[in-house]
Amino acid sequence: MFKNNLRFTSWINQHKFYQLDLSLKTRSIKQIVLTLVFKTLVLGFFGLIVIFPFYLMVVVSFASDERALDTRTPILWPDSWNFDNFSRVLSDGKYLNAIVVNTLVTVLSVLLTLFFTICMGYSFSLRKWKYKKLVWFFFLSVLILPESALLIGQYRIVIVANWNNPNSPLIVLGLIMPFVSSVFSGFMYRTSFEAIPSQLKESALIDGCNGFNYFLKIALPMVKSTSWTVGILTAFSAWNSYLWPLLLLGNRVDLNINLWVLQQGILDANSSDEQIRTLLNLKMSAAILAILPMFIIYFLFHKRIMNAIKNRANTIKG
């Protein structure tokens, strides 16, 4: 009798555990399916928000002038593929010159930013020097100010240095003024240099390596990922700048690609009462030509760009 009761109790327990395990499996499958559906919907929604403007830009760039002027009907698909729109915006002959100047400004901004921020970050990573904390606090206080608040001081410097003449080669120095240094980039380099073990520097000094050789041959290669991050972010910032070139160049659209895009597709009014009309198909064609170099750079260095964004996010969190 006791054995039968024991067997019956064991069977009941096994049956309960089987039902419990089955319910957990069923619940986990439901959670996985619901989570997958939720992630798909959320990612699809935000992906649509990001991709749709690019899709609209490409579609409108091939539209005819009649459809571009008709603001009542949205252009979701072109009635014809008008590649002539691209040749029309290139006919003014200013695109190539704007691309060359923009590239020169971007390259110089990246090189000078790397030089100044590396020196800044390394100097603040050193352990002791007089008034280090006070000077660092002063630099960090600049981060509180918005970039637009610094334009007045930067513009004043450019005026005093006579770098604001669009007909002079010195205008390039004026255009790179806001991008040659960055406190945030210096902060990134300081964090990276401080992460290098102090024992490594001590071993290098014992082996006869002086301070400059340690910085050049050991410390600098170890912050290569930070250099890629700073370089990529500076390049995008300098290439996409609009307010500062507008302030310096005015109507010289041949010296900045964004100003060139802004002037495309504008129709002169036939009378004083008529509003100025804009051909969006030409403006979108110009926008595609303007972002084409950055798209090429992105596809060549997309892995490093994503790592740069990730490193910047980790720096902000840290």
UniProtKB/Swiss-Prot annotation:
<feature type="transmembrane region" description="Helical">
    <location>
        <begin position="42"/>
        <end position="62"/>
    </location>
</feature>
<dbReference type="GO" id="GO:0005886">
    <property type="term" value="C:plasma membrane"/>
</dbReference>
<feature type="transmembrane region" description="Helical">
    <location>
        <begin position="134"/>
        <end position="154"/>
    </location>
</feature>
<dbReference type="InterPro" id="IPR035906">
    <property type="entry name" value="MetI-like_sf"/>
</dbReference>
<keyword id="KW-0812">Transmembrane</keyword>
<dbReference type="GO" id="GO:0055085">
    <property type="term" value="P:transmembrane transport"/>
</dbReference>
<feature type="transmembrane region" description="Helical">
    <location>
        <begin position="98"/>
        <end position="118"/>
    </location>
</feature>
<feature type="transmembrane region" description="Helical">
    <location>
        <begin position="169"/>
        <end position="189"/>
    </location>
</feature>
<keyword id="KW-0813">Transport</keyword>
<dbReference type="InterPro" id="IPR000515">
    <property type="entry name" value="MetI-like"/>
</dbReference>
<comment type="similarity">
    <text>Belongs to the binding-protein-dependent transport system permease family. MalFG subfamily.</text>
</comment>
<feature type="domain" description="ABC transmembrane type-1">
    <location>
        <begin position="99"/>
        <end position="301"/>
    </location>
</feature>
<protein>
    <recommendedName>
        <fullName>Probable ABC transporter permease protein MG189</fullName>
    </recommendedName>
</protein>
<keyword id="KW-1133">Transmembrane helix</keyword>
<keyword id="KW-1003">Cell membrane</keyword>
<feature type="transmembrane region" description="Helical">
    <location>
        <begin position="282"/>
        <end position="302"/>
    </location>
</feature>
<feature type="transmembrane region" description="Helical">
    <location>
        <begin position="230"/>
        <end position="250"/>
    </location>
</feature>
<keyword id="KW-0472">Membrane</keyword>
<comment type="function">
    <text>Probably part of a binding-protein-dependent transport system. Probably responsible for the translocation of the substrate across the membrane.</text>
</comment>
